[in-house]
């Protein structure tokens, strides 16, 4: 990693632990900062805080005392999930204290070039595809960021022979200043996380931070299926490389079942190892990045053909007596579920849907669920999802939790059918995150097979 001294002897407050906060605290300590960690979880239930204290880092737990900011901190590094409406952050900003996320730290110390991937849907799959293609080509793609490996941790071990492939959320990108990837990808932009950002325009602005420091020597890969992406091309200094499944573009595109890059066939769409039109888009974005990094077509084709998907992203789980189970727990919004359904014959699908109620109706989903064999509906949003099912003329049953839903879906399915967990909702009404929800689905499928 690069040795930098801008944090040496500077007082830094790390707000919120989890993986990213813990990693940031250790990195800042290593860089010579005077670190204070503040986390809401009580000390006795906080193994991360206990470990940091043993390492000599000051920790304050069990709440977020505003008087803590009476100290003269030079910087705050916050957990991405903590909203800017948090009183601690509001006070820090009012005092002129810069508020960053650990992504900024990762950029500052990384010896490796950075490829950043953001968007509303497809981030994790595209990040993983890019990482695997680059690694197959000998460029060693190191996955980091929102994909589960703290960027500031991975950046410490990355050399200039590696490539840091970073999945970036809007939450993370709100806290960057100098962050400068060589290539950035925006998979798509849809109205999500409005409860955090306040409006769609603010959400888009957060995503757009990914390109703030890019120049004409850098590449910004955009989804030209969306007019919004086309409109944004005039607002960046970066060189835009488009991808599209709807039209021929000066980049990566789909035509007559083939995936092209600037007029050259790379592979057939039906050779991609995972189903669904959304994965064609993900593959096109990956092809664009790979070609910009001079990866040969054969390596791209072999890697994407062998690609088995990502856990919780349209993940094939098992086959029980001819019934296939797919875990798409990461589908936390309507678009993601629409994309998932596009890969299947609706008449053979039993869909499990519902979760956190964010107040939105599901009318947009009606055309996509029309013709489903059955639905199993659960969660806070159940009444809203049921209204959409009624409009689509789809019969449904209700479930109390994911295990119950999985069992009921299997009972409704017959040989040749698909049980698809694609909730179109976040998990937080019942579960800590979509991973917990997906793991419970996987565990229940395993029990059904016994």
From Swiss-Prot:
Its EC number is 6.3.2.9. SUPFAM superfamilies: MurCD N-terminal domain (SSF51984), MurD-like peptide ligases, catalytic domain (SSF53623), MurD-like peptide ligases, peptide-binding domain (SSF53244). GO terms for cellular component: cytoplasm. One of its GO terms (molecular function) is ATP binding. It catalyses: UDP-N-acetyl-alpha-D-muramoyl-L-alanine + D-glutamate + ATP = UDP-N-acetyl-alpha-D-muramoyl-L-alanyl-D-glutamate + ADP + phosphate + H(+). It comes from the Bacteria. InterPro entries: Mur-like_cat_sf (IPR036565), Mur_ligase_C (IPR004101), Mur_ligase_C_dom_sf (IPR036615), Mur_ligase_cen (IPR013221), MurD (IPR005762). Belongs to the MurCDEF family. This is UDP-N-acetylmuramoylalanine--D-glutamate ligase. The lineage of its organism: Bacteria, Bacillati, Bacillota, Bacilli, Lactobacillales.
